[in-house]
Amino acid sequence: MEEWKLPWEGGCRCGATRIRVTRPPLLTMACHCAGCQRMSASAYSLSVAVPADGFEVIAGDPVLGGKGRDVHHFCPECMTWMFTRPPGLDFLVNVRAPVLDDHLWVVPFVETFTEEGFAWARTPAPHSFATMPEMEGWQTLTAAFATEGARP
């Protein structure tokens, strides 16, 4: 399997907030839940889950928003939804794939909450779930992604 070509950088729409990823991702995913649809103003949100110790904000000072149980971070200038820190999962950060400077390689490996999604909006993800998989299942998914997931 090819190397990850790290580090990656990315930014918001206006360029005021920038991020850097220095460790390989754990997983790529599309979430079809109603919350992600509303937050992204799209059929689903596309994320790259990265280890928290391989993620940093290198410019700007993101603000919290979006409400709900997850902690969503936005650029304070253009309000681009940049990343999420799910509570209880302090080891990871869900980076919104489109904020990466080089993001066209991202293919969702997992899609979640398909029962809430548009019937026409399915992805090529090899693993699809009507809701959120149980926590025990994520270890198997991340191990599979490490060998089978798309690379830049």
Task: State each model region's role.
Residues M1-P152:
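A short Gly-Trp-Pro
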